[in-house]
A protein has these predicted regions:
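Short glycine-/small-residue-rich Rossmann-like dinucleotide-binding loops
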Residues: 64-66
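NAD(P)+-binding Rossmann beta1-loop-alpha1 motif at the extreme N-terminus of oxidoreductases
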Residues: 1-51, 59
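Short acidic alpha-helix that forms the nucleotide-activated donor recognition element
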Residues: 55
Length: 66
């Protein structure tokens, strides 16, 4: 399954790690570029979620403050 996650805070980051641990493909986006870069370098996500790859996602999770 391919998952897109918007927001890599406490909830989004935890979900990204859990889906990645279950060997799913994880795309993610965060407003803070440093957090997004760290998530990619640490292996928590596969790539940046963008308009080009959002159509590949079976599930998109919005994990931002209301």
């Amino acid at each position: 399954m391919t998952v897109g996650i918007v927001g890599l805070g406490l909830i989004g980051g935890s979900l990204a790690k859990a889906y990645k641990k279950s060997e799913h493909t994880v795309y993610s986006y965060d407003i803070d570029k440093k957090i997004l870069d760290f998530a990619i370098l640490s292996g928590a996500v596969d790539d940046i979620l963008s308009f080009e790859n959002i159509n590949k996602c079976n599930l998109v999770l919005l994990c931002v403050y209301p």
